[in-house]
């Protein structure tokens, strides 16, 4: 783990928290939109949410687990509120107008609450697993294991809280199937696309940080 100034850590906390909020908000909207792939039911949220695990794993690798946990706790409440507002305004993928905020939407509230709980469980487990394995010589072991375990708790918690006995008949009937397919797609997407991306971004960021450290050292001398 590199040594960073307090200013660098505050900047990382701000921008990474903003990124987490963006992914959570978009995923909570996209999870309302079912899609069928090769006869299996899933949602578009399966394709956006893995970005969270990529960002978290890079944060733990470069900045350490404490900053990653600070990001998780900083994001939880704002994500809950923003997710409810966005999902209410664009309920079932259609613009509802600002008048939709005047009425409590139980379906959207369940999605926002489920996202709150699932995000906390999934990310805390992801940080814990990754932090335990990040010293391994196999660079791919920590992100792979943390993705597998983090996504299990995240997916099960989210779909159970959001869609068990949901007012949406389709989601209430198919939530277990969708959760299983969603998990499989998340893992597949993460391993095929995000794991190589993790390796590339890690090397790029470490090189950039090393170059900046050398420049700062030269300027100081």
UniProtKB/Swiss-Prot annotation:
<feature type="topological domain" description="Periplasmic">
    <location>
        <position position="34"/>
    </location>
</feature>
<keyword id="KW-1133">Transmembrane helix</keyword>
<keyword id="KW-1003">Cell membrane</keyword>
<feature type="transmembrane region" description="Helical">
    <location>
        <begin position="144"/>
        <end position="164"/>
    </location>
</feature>
<feature type="transmembrane region" description="Helical">
    <location>
        <begin position="98"/>
        <end position="118"/>
    </location>
</feature>
<comment type="function">
    <text>Involved in the import of queuosine (Q) precursors, required for Q precursor salvage. Transports 7-cyano-7-deazaguanine (preQ(0)) and 7-aminomethyl-7-deazaguanine (preQ(1)), with a preference for preQ(0).</text>
</comment>
<feature type="transmembrane region" description="Helical">
    <location>
        <begin position="71"/>
        <end position="91"/>
    </location>
</feature>
<feature type="transmembrane region" description="Helical">
    <location>
        <begin position="35"/>
        <end position="55"/>
    </location>
</feature>
<keyword id="KW-0813">Transport</keyword>
<dbReference type="GO" id="GO:0072531">
    <property type="term" value="P:pyrimidine-containing compound transmembrane transport"/>
</dbReference>
<protein>
    <recommendedName>
        <fullName>Queuosine precursor transporter</fullName>
    </recommendedName>
</protein>
<keyword id="KW-0472">Membrane</keyword>
<feature type="transmembrane region" description="Helical">
    <location>
        <begin position="185"/>
        <end position="205"/>
    </location>
</feature>
<feature type="topological domain" description="Periplasmic">
    <location>
        <begin position="165"/>
        <end position="184"/>
    </location>
</feature>
<comment type="similarity">
    <text>Belongs to the vitamin uptake transporter (VUT/ECF) (TC 2.A.88) family. Q precursor transporter subfamily.</text>
</comment>
<feature type="topological domain" description="Cytoplasmic">
    <location>
        <begin position="206"/>
        <end position="221"/>
    </location>
</feature>
<feature type="topological domain" description="Periplasmic">
    <location>
        <begin position="92"/>
        <end position="97"/>
    </location>
</feature>
<dbReference type="Pfam" id="PF02592">
    <property type="entry name" value="Vut_1"/>
</dbReference>
<feature type="topological domain" description="Cytoplasmic">
    <location>
        <begin position="119"/>
        <end position="143"/>
    </location>
</feature>
<dbReference type="GO" id="GO:0022857">
    <property type="term" value="F:transmembrane transporter activity"/>
</dbReference>
<dbReference type="InterPro" id="IPR003744">
    <property type="entry name" value="YhhQ"/>
</dbReference>
<keyword id="KW-0812">Transmembrane</keyword>
<feature type="topological domain" description="Cytoplasmic">
    <location>
        <begin position="1"/>
        <end position="12"/>
    </location>
</feature>
<keyword id="KW-0997">Cell inner membrane</keyword>
<feature type="topological domain" description="Cytoplasmic">
    <location>
        <begin position="56"/>
        <end position="70"/>
    </location>
</feature>
<dbReference type="GO" id="GO:1990397">
    <property type="term" value="P:queuosine salvage"/>
</dbReference>
<feature type="transmembrane region" description="Helical">
    <location>
        <begin position="13"/>
        <end position="33"/>
    </location>
</feature>
<dbReference type="GO" id="GO:0005886">
    <property type="term" value="C:plasma membrane"/>
</dbReference>
